[in-house]
Amino acid sequence: MTTPTLDLAIITGLSGAGRSTAAKCLEDLGWFVVDNLPPELLSTMAELGRRSGGAISRIAVVVDVRGRPFFSDLRAAIAALDARGMHPRMLFLEASDDALIRRFEHVRRPHPLQRDERVVDGIGRERILLAELRGEADLVLDTTDLNVHELRSKIDAAFGQPNANRLNATVVSFGYKYGLPLDADLVADCRFLPNPHWVEALRPFTGRDPQVRDYVLAQPGAQDFLDQYSALLRLVGEGYAREGKRYLTLAVGCTGGKHRSVAIAEQLGIRLAAGGVGVRVVHRDLGRE
């Protein structure tokens, strides 16, 4: 049996340069992130990933190597991984002295290496300690002029997978008489459309059945609603993507959650999928009556 491929990343760099933010970005991309792992445990962590049967395929480790022993341990750990055919990528984060000073002043915390001196002294000391490690990094990111979203974009480009940035939407149909979905980001009300419940021939069927679907979609305003709401969702989706939000729950409601909301939710799912959105359609209250 083929052993699943394991992707390893090491996140390190200057204090205040964005290691924690980078770790959160990788976590959002589906990486298994371990913070402040001693370098000598890297091989153990990698072995756990290999034995997971593919459940853990990407591991990112945040390593603090300000001390010389830790630096030596990290180099030895990387060499051991290389010898076993596992080649971790190293991301090194840095920023200008001015940017780092502003960040430490903003959080009102001392630099870990400043001792009884100024923040800038601690930064300088750390630069010297990590200079050799910086030269061995696969990717060096200067975060001086980057906001969180720009840093996320760069990490996405370097460590993401195809479709990693794709918006994923769950479209939930529901009945108002059973209450709103608590996790909904956006709610659409389909009760402006005539209710098939009052058409005796349609009452036993649901919005997934062709006769009900065709009836709902043929009503005045149904197609206009789908066109305009889909356009709105594209606009909102682009904004969410820029903000790093990749999961969206869209609720579509009617009185009982059987006819109109089901038909409209199905159509919204089709339109969103055609626009490149990952879609899952759920009919919360179907069969509840």
UniProtKB/Swiss-Prot annotation:
Belongs to the RapZ-like family. Gene3D superfamilies: P-loop containing nucleotide triphosphate hydrolases (3.40.50.300). This is Nucleotide-binding protein Francci3_1634. The keyword Nucleotide-binding applies. InterPro entries: P-loop_NTPase, RapZ-like, RapZ-like_N, RapZ_C. Pfam families: PapZ_C (PF22740), RapZ-like_N (PF03668). It comes from the Bacteria. It comes from Frankia casuarinae (strain DSM 45818 / CECT 9043 / HFP020203 / CcI3). ATP binds at G13, L14, S15, G16, A17, G18, R19, S20.
